[in-house]
Amino acid sequence: MSLHRLLAALVFVSTIAHPALAQNVTDSHLQRIAAVKAVRVCIWPDYYSITYRNPRTQQLSGVDIDMANELGKDLGVGVQFVDSSFAKLIEDVTQDHCDVAMFAIGVTPLRAEKLRFTKPHLASDIFAITTKSNRRIKGWDDIDKSGTVVAVAKGTLHEPVMKSKLKAAQLLVLDTPFAREQEVQSGRADVFMTDYPYSQRFLANAEWARLVSPPGEYHVTPYAYAIKPGDDIWHARLERFVADIKRDGRLLASAKQHGLSLIVAH
């Protein structure tokens, strides 16, 4: 069923069953998407394996780039990518700068107060990156010690998690692109905290970097897509999309291509 026919059916059913809800249907993001024939998708273009823009070619790649394009195909519309970041996520979504944010967004209590999430499609624990030459950090237990500097990106889920977890180490919160990586490479910080997708791609491209993994589960976070609250119709359509890409194998195929099959949520 085309997007226009789907919307018409929803309007008809809502008007018959609940006349007061008809306006809600026509005010849905789906109505705007159908009208302009494009869905606006917020991404963080520095997210390796998820929504990464190659600085040389400007080409976008990653599992959520693939899934955004699949969403456009399912809706029968084009896809317009909108640059965002974790620091700007809530503002961009709630101010309607995009219809949906699709960059493996960790579902946290703070974000859940402001945004509405789909069911998760990925889930990742937290990992650390240090330099191969760092003598202070030999394993995970060396991170939370006096004198250690731990870098995180502002607005990421790692900021509140590490604020609550660290007891002895110093937390350094940075809000410019690749600042945490530069702090570690320069030696001003000992480690930066990240997730599985980013760590795998980063290690493949940074000869100086070394992965530090937790000995067991540290803080696994589900990743999902996020929209502005109050649009039940758009949320239901996205939930159907997430269920579809899990069932028909599109999500797993893309995850395998980008080396992320281990963190697909089932």
Feature annotation, model-predicted:
Residues 23-24, 157-172, 210-214, 243-266:
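Ligand-binding clefts/hinges and TM-proximal coupling segments of bilobed small-molecule sensing domains
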Residues 42-48, 82-87, 96-108, 131, ...:
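Beta->alpha turn/N-cap motifs
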Residues 122-130, 196, 200-243, 261-266:
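Periplasmic-binding protein-like
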Residues 51-55, 68-77, 140-144, 155-175, ...:
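Ligand-binding cleft/hinge of the Venus flytrap
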Residues 88-91, 104-113, 161-164, 185-219:
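A ligand-binding cleft/hinge motif common to bilobed small-molecule-binding domains
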